[in-house]
Structure formats: structure tokens, C-alpha cells
């Protein structure tokens, strides 16, 4: 009989809709929602331009001073929660989805940030093969506050607790110190404008996103800035392995500015002379000194303990 597809030898032509009982139900339409602007051709996985991009030599992507890339699920999410302005959110194809990634995508979409799903090889390239956990956020350069504003914010919620860095050149140390300051209720960090680590993607990553909450200021002259803080009532405490005051004897309840130098060089001469006292951390065994970020964490933890009493 005509139209009887069950008769012997009957073959249905492919591509016909006859016999279909389930429609798309709007699935195609929903799949296109919330993905942001269409990415360029070289970012579309199935486009010939993308295949050429993947097969090209993996050279580091040229970076400019106009943007910075924050890597990792916690740092990216903290940036978006803090309202840090961003221009693009990159998510690697095939990345395992968790609550942090889901919230990051939703927050980015809510504020109009372009969400680009890219090959993992491309994300490796723009991050110079640093650990990114399948997600990266492109942001403007870090916004440093003025040291006077840092002091004002600290005195608004006494007792003030600020940290200054002298000769710290490793951004991982800076990021770890930012994280400790956030963990122990510090108000901010002061770094020299020259010959110092700055808030880069590496520092963002090490801080686990705390850089979005802790203000950082730059000083053209660290010694002069410390003197201003001292004149405003802060007690300036230096950290050094040969300090004349043991941490056990430190009164951490006063408004404080804690100054730390590098593990190798320690505090510079002028900065050391700017301190009201220099504190050492009692240690057992043959260990002479601690990494700068570890030393800051130990001292801030002791100050926080005293302030809770």
C-alpha cells in the first residue's frame, strides 16, 4: 500500500520528518542562550581557522600592559564576586564543571562579560602554560590605591593592621602575603613602586583570589611612607631573624604596621631604622630564617590571637 513503510523492501529516505514523534522542544534555542558574543573564527573548535591555530607552534602570546589574565577557579570567582571589571572569561573545552565554574559563568553573563569556550591548547598559550584549571579571566591592570587611602581605610576600623614589603621580588610571595593579610583581618599592603613584585596573574593565583578584597598601595619612597604612618599613630614593627624583641613579647593590640624584608636580604638599612622595634620569631633547630610569606603569616596569626582576647 502507498505509504506503508513496513512492507518488504521499503526504505525511508534520510532527512525526512515523516514518523517523527518528538520535536526539539526549543532545545536548539535554549542551547544558544547565555553564551555571549560569537567568538572569532580562530576560537571556534570546528572552524578551519581554529584548526590552523591549534596546529601552529606553541609560542607564548605577546602580552601588553593593557590587560592581565587571572587564572584558576577561586581567583576568577573572587574577582567576579568583587566586581572587578573584566573583558572576557575563557573556559577550556571539556573542562569539568563544578559550583565555582558555574557561578563564574553566571556572574560573567549577568554583567555582560564575553564568555568564550576555547580549546585547552589555546588557553595554555595565553596563560604561558601556567596552571589555569580550565578557566581564565581577562581583566585590566590591577588598580593600586594611594598609601594615604590605605591608612584612612585602616583607621576607620581600628585597631589598624597594615603590612609593608621591603625587597620582596617574587610575586608568589606577594600573593601568599595578600592571602595571609585577608585571613587575619589585615587592612592592606604597601609595596615600593620600584624593585618590587607587583600584583600580576601569578600573585592573583597565589592569593587564591584574596587580591580582589585586600587593597595594595605603591610608595615611591617606602621609608617616607612609614614615617607618615608613624606620625599618624601606627607603631612600625620590622621582622628580622636577629630582631631585638621576641614575637612572644610583642603587644599586638596597638595599631600596627608590620614590615617584612626578603629572606635573603632582610630589611634594608633605612627601613630598619624607620621601625619602632624589630621582632624575631623564636625557632627551634638549625633553621635561621623563614620565607617572607611564612613569617608574615606567623606574626599576623599571633596579632590576631591577641586581638581576640
From Swiss-Prot:
GO BP term, example = RNA processing
Matching entries from SUPFAM superfamilies are given as: alpha/beta knot (SSF75217), L30e-like (SSF55315)
EC top class, as a word: transferase
GO CC annotation terms, alphabetical = cytosol
A Gene Ontology molecular-function term?
RNA binding
Which keywords fit this entry according to its UniProt record? Answer: Methyltransferase, S-adenosyl-L-methionine, Transferase
Binding residue positions for S-adenosyl-L-methionine: 261, 281, 290
Region of interest: Disordered: 1-69
Matching NCBIfam families: rRNA_methyl_3
The protein, known as:
Uncharacterized tRNA/rRNA methyltransferase ML0324
The record lists the organism as: Mycobacterium leprae (strain TN)
Tell me the organism's taxonomic lineage. Bacteria, Bacillati, Actinomycetota, Actinomycetes, Mycobacteriales
Amino acid at each position: 500500500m502507498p505509504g506503508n513503510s513496513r512492507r518488504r523492501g521499503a526504505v525511508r529516505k534520510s532527512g525526512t520528518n515523516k514518523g517523527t514523534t518528538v520535536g526539539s522542544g526549543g532545545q536548539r534555542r535554549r542551547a544558544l542562550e547565555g553564551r555571549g558574543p560569537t567568538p572569532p573564527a580562530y576560537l571556534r573548535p570546528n572552524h578551519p581557522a581554529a584548526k590552523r591555530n591549534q596546529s601552529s607552534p606553541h609560542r607564548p602570546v605577546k602580552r601588553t600592559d593593557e590587560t592581565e589574565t587571572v587564572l584558576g577557579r577561586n581567583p576568577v570567582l573572587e574577582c567576579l564576586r568583587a566586581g572587578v571589571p573584566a573583558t572576557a572569561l575563557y573556559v577550556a573545552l571539556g573542562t569539568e564543571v563544578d559550583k565555582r565554574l558555574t557561578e563564574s559563568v553566571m556572574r560573567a553573563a549577568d554583567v555582560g562579560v564575553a564568555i568564550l569556550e576555547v580549546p585547552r591548547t589555546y588557553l595554555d598559550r595565553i596563560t604561558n602554560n601556567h596552571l589555569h584549571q580550565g578557566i581564565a579571566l581577562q581583566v585590566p591592570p590591577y588598580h593600586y590605591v594611594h598609601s594615604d587611602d590605605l591608612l584612612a581605610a585602616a583607621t576607620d576600623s581600628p585597631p589598624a593592621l597594615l603590612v609593608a614589603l621591603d625587597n620582596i621580588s617574587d610575586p608568589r610571595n606577594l600573593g601568599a602575603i595578600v592571602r595571609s593579610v585577608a585571613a587575619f583581618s589585615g587592612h592592606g599592603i604597601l609595596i615600593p613602586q620600584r624593585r618590587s613584585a607587583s600584583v600580576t596573574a601569578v600573585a592573583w593565583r597565589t592569593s587564591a583570589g584574596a587580591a580582589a578584597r585586600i587593597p595594595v598601595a605603591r610608595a615611591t619612597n617606602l621609608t617616607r611612607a612609614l614615617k607618615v604612618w608613624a606620625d599618624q599613630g601606627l607603631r612600625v614593627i620590622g621582622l628580622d631573624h636577629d630582631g631585638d624583641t621576641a614575637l612572644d613579647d610583642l603587644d599586638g593590640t596597638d595599631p600596627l604596621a608590620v614590615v617584612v624584608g626578603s629572606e635573603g636580604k632582610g630589611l634594608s638599612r633605612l627601613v630598619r631604622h624607620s621601625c619602632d622595634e624589630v621582632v624575631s620569631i623564636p625557632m627551634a633547630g638549625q633553621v635561621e630564617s623563614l620565607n617572607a610569606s611564612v613569617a608574615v603569616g606567623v606574626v599576623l596569626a599571633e596579632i590576631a590571637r591577641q586581638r581576640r582576647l
